[in-house]
A protein has these predicted regions:
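Short S/T/G/P-rich N-terminal loop/turn motif that feeds into the first structured element of a domain
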Residues: 1-50, 55-71, 86-93
Length: 93
């Protein structure tokens, strides 16, 4: 049983290129901190101001709240615009 956090960002005042560079740096930095999690950044194909970071864990322990890394990323991304943060739990077999 794993879990997935999705942190979506809708930015308005920053160029797409700069936002993508910032997201790449955040993913690199946070991946170094915790190698148990898979952290990836995505950009929305049809909306240039939308991006997201996905944090995937294959941990067997259940979660009921966002991870510490997820909360930190959310706080950082709020500087750039509207942020949505959702935690998903994998269905048991």
């Amino acid at each position: 049983m794993g879990w997935l956090e999705i942190i979506e960002l809708r930015s308005s005042e920053i160029s797409r290129e700069k936002m993508e560079d910032n997201l790449r740096k955040l993913v690199r930095d946070f991946s170094r901190i915790n190698n148990e999690l898979e952290i990836k950044a995505y950009k929305r194909i049809d909306v240039g101001t939308d991006s997201s970071i996905h944090i995937l864990s294959r941990s067997t322990k259940s979660v009921s709240t966002a991870s510490e890394i997820g909360e930190k990323l959310k706080a950082i991304l709020k500087e750039y615009g509207y942020v949505s943060h959702i935690v998903w739990s994998e269905l048991d077999d």
